[in-house]
């Protein structure tokens, strides 16, 4: 189907990483693109929403003019997608601009779902960019309390508090000490590492509780911090969980592994109900 894109969402971290060809990107030599030499062409953008303008002859579930969520479409005026890849935006209460964030929000869904949170567990969301803002809200909806956030930007910390964080910390060298103090010395039960910084992962390992879980939502592309895995992971029974979108279920949702389309539908329901702030 041919879709005219009304909005596409910028994923600053991923797009910048590819533009400067950081390790473990599609543009670096030997990266996940499979191109031995890496480099360009590179088509940034993977998240948006638009309207169907033309259908394939055998498509029955959609009509021209339907609003749809567009994933992996790039920053371009039009995209060509298969019917199975699309989710229609039926609820008129949902603005198309808000709906355009569904795909990137699904990454945060995955990062939180993989933690298998239980009501009453303490959680840290490390990083309050676009993914962190969604992860914070999803953790709150999952019953996390106390719920902490960390970011260097004071405006982001202020927003985190407005969105329900119990406390928001500056991730400096005293972060682990302050989180431990805020949890009575126990540490948090679970954490979502959103920054993609190996230093932030080291911090998380210092403030996570014994047998805690850390979901790696941000892309830790550069391993520039040595980690004592015996001290911080093995001996303390810590679970590190890869939460890249490539690990999600493809056709049928399961606990902790929902399909993209099911996460889109959940996102739309939360937006329509006023339970998620964009």
Give the role of each language-model region:
Residues 1-10, 20-74:
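Glycine-rich beta-strand-centered segment in the early N-terminal region that forms part
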Residues 41, 78, 124, 128, ...:
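Glycine- and other small-residue-rich loops at beta-strand/loop junctions that grip anionic moieties
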Residues 62-63, 117, 208:
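Short, well-ordered loop/turn sites that connect or cap secondary structure elements
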Residues 79-92, 143-145:
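Short, compositionally biased
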Residues 93, 97-173, 177:
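Mid-domain Rossmann-like dinucleotide-binding core that forms the NAD(H)/NADP(H) cofactor-binding site
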Residues 158-241:
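Glycine-rich cofactor phosphate-binding loops and adjacent beta1-alpha1 units
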Residues 185, 227-278:
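C-terminal substrate-binding/catalytic core of Rossmann-like NAD(P)-dependent dehydrogenases/reductases
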